[in-house]
């Protein structure tokens, strides 16, 4: 056991986590040079295309150190995005230490901090590594000072390496062996294994990635899942080297996979504990805290026949992505679908893209909303994440919106732009500290503003240099109202949104004008209105197409023409009563893109 090292690689987006893991795999001979591909561990196509890591992946390597001993390194490559920070905390639960990778050119960024603090809270040993020292703009001295100054861990003798060219990779491996502690646990005790991750394989059923805390799990053992009490047989156990490699047993301190032919999707939930069916452990390990979704949106299949396959797809995805929450929803405009909870907008985009690619579905998304706390006049408190569930205005005593604490790191030349943006988003400044060339800003912002397009706007006002991380702190009373869109006097539930009172006029007008462009002309006039309660605040009309009914009259009496025109008028009136207007897909998307 003293030769096992479990660690995660944590870093800000694009500081070279995945490339560093590629080098470690190559150095330890996990894959031959022929099998190496850039970003070996980013197994999804989306990950490769966008160049981001979404799922944490684990690898087991053997490394012969300079002291002549062979060490088993289990490491987990983690995502860097704010939206996936829970993936990071999950990976850390399986480790004793973490490599904090910092780009020697960019320096410390917000996500570096956030992930590092997560690790320190879990009593991890954090080992700083300065990456990209081959770049002309690399300044390892300055960055080492920054790490000590902002993060507060020793970095004077941090390892310097370049994952791209392979300089210093040996040193990284030596530091891992020297500085990261070996796992603790009782090899003789009853089995306790923590499920770090699970995914569904259509041939093998559920594949679970586990970390053995105590005891030994052998192939063919009968084990039970502690939360459900179900018993299974361990058909295959093994490790990823990154290829799936079967072994006969997983010992205390090791990280590996287990396949037990579990067919029901929620058979082995992430964060659960496995133990032997006979003489097992009495109590489960401390799992992970359940992540609460921050953003909700409705997703609807374009053709109603896809509803069942959509549900299956969601079930399979939720096994792999423990933060996904969904419940059935119906909309008069869009039919049957699901209300889905996400961790942020990037997460939402990725999930939608995975559903469309991996499961061949065509989906419509409604505007994302956050959760509001509402105190009704009866004194009851409810939580609403769907604008159409909002009680009538006269039943609401008080509406409270979620506030997040946002930490932004920005080079000082862009400070002004960023402050202007935060003020525009109704932010309250809490703190401002200078660290050398960087400024650390702390703002309290309404989550609804952060979720919509804050990240993109922040990047564009700071030329991509600012970075942010945020977490929910509390609900705060706010003047929020529901804005409805009426088409010919009928509410379109999928277009409703909850917004701040100060924005109704501008948002209402913008929406109405956008709808006017996007809804095709019909044979009768269409009124598009924006309303709050019963008060109409903006309106525009889509004019009818007309047929020239008098074209066939040459000369003759004017009353003949009048008769034909009146007949047309009657027909249009009748049509307007029964005619319904199809709202095209683009109109729903327009709500999301209103700020452009």
Curated annotation (Swiss-Prot):
Main location: membrane
Enzyme Commission number(s): 3.6.5.n1
InterPro entries, alphabetized: EF-4, EFG_III/V, EFG_V-like, EFTu-like_2, G_TR_CS, LepA_C_sf, LepA_CTD, LepA_IV
GO molecular function: GTP binding; GTPase activity; guanosine tetraphosphate binding; ribosome binding; translation elongation factor activity
Cellular compartment(s): Cell inner membrane
Binding site residues for GTP: 14-19, 131-134
Superkingdom as given in the UniProt entry: Bacteria
Cross-referenced CDD domains: EF4_II (cd03699), EF4_III (cd16260), LepA (cd01890), lepA_C (cd03709)
Membrane-topology annotation of the record: Peripheral membrane protein
Sequence similarity: Belongs to the TRAFAC class translation factor GTPase superfamily. Classic translation factor GTPase family. LepA subfamily.
PANTHER family in the record: TRANSLATION FACTOR GUF1 HOMOLOG, CHLOROPLASTIC, TRANSLATION FACTOR GUF1-RELATED
Protein name (Swiss-Prot/TrEMBL): Elongation factor 4
Organism: Shewanella sediminis (strain HAW-EB3)
Lineage, uppermost ranks: Bacteria, Pseudomonadati, Pseudomonadota, Gammaproteobacteria, Alteromonadales
Gene designation: lepA
């Amino acid at each position: 056991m003293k030769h096992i090292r479990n660690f995660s690689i944590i870093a800000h987006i694009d500081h070279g986590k995945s490339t560093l893991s590629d080098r470690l795999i190559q150095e330890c001979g996990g894959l031959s040079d022929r099998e190496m591909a850039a970003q070996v561990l980013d197994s999804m196509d989306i990950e490769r295309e966008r160049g981001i890591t979404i799922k944490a992946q684990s690898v087991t390597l053997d490394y012969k150190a300079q002291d002549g001993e062979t060490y088993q390194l289990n490491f987990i490559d983690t995502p860097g995005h704010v939206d996936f920070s829970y993936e990071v905390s999950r990976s850390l639960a399986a480790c004793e230490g973490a490599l904090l990778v910092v780009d020697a050119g960019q320096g410390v960024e917000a996500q570096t901090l956030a992930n590092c603090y997560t690790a320190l809270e879990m009593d991890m040993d954090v080992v700083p590594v300065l990456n990209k020292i081959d770049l002309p703009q690399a300044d390892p001295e300055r960055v080492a000072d920054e790490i000590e100054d902002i993060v507060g861990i020793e970095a004077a003798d941090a390892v310097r390496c370049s994952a791209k060219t392979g300089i210093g990779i040996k040193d990284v491996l030596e530091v891992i062996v020297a500085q990261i502690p070996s796992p603790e646990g009782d090899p003789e005790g009853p089995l306790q294994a923590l499920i770090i991750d699970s995914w569904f394989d259509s041939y093998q059923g559920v594949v679970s990635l586990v970390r053995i805390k105590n005891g030994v799990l052998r192939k063919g053992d009968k084990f039970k899942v502690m939360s459900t009490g179900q018993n299974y047989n361990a058909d295959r156990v093994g490790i990823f080297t990154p290829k799936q490699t079967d072994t006969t047993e997983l010992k205390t301190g090791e990280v590996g996979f287990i396949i037990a032919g579990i067919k029901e999707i929620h058979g082995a939930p992430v964060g659960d504990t496995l133990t032997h069916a006979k003489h097992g452990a009495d109590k489960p390990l401390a799992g992970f805290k359940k992540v609460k979704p921050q953003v909700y949106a409705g997703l609807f299949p374009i053709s109603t026949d896809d509803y069942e396959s959509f549900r299956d797809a969601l079930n399979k995805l939720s096994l792999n992505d423990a933060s996904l929450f969904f419940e059935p929803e119906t909309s008069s405009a869009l039919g049957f679908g699901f209300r889905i909870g996400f961790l942020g907008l990037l997460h939402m985009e990725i999930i939608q893209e995975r559903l469309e690619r991996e499961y061949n579905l065509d989906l419509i998304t409604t505007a994302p909303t956050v959760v509001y706390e509402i105190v009704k006049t009866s004194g009851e408190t409810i939580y609403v994440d769907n604008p159409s569930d909002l009680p009538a205005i006269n039943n609401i005593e008080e509406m409270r919106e979620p506030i997040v604490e946002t930490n932004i790191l920005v080079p000082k030349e862009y400070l002004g732009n960023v402050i202007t943006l935060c003020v525009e988003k109704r932010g309250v400044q809490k703190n401002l500290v200078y660290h050398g060339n960087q400024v650390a800003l702390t703002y309290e912002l309404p989550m609804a503003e952060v979720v919509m397009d804050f990240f993109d706007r922040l990047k564009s006002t700071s030329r991509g240099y600012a970075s942010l991380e945020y977490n929910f702190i509390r609900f705060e009373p706010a003047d929020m109202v529901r804005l409805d869109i009426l088409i010919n006097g009928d509410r379109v539930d999928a277009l409703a949104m909850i917004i701040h009172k100060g924005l109704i006029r501008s948002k209402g007008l913008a929406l109405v004008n956008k709808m006017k462009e996007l809804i095709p002309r019909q044979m009768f006039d269409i009124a598009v209105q924006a309303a709050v309660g019963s008060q109409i605040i903006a309106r525009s009309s889509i004019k009818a197409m007309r047929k020239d009914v008098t074209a066939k009259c040459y000369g003759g009496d004017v009353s003949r023409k009048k008769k034909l025109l009146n007949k047309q008028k009657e027909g249009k009136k009748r049509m307007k009563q029964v005619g319904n207007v199809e709202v095209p897909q683009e109109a729903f998307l327009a709500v999301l893109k209103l700020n452009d």
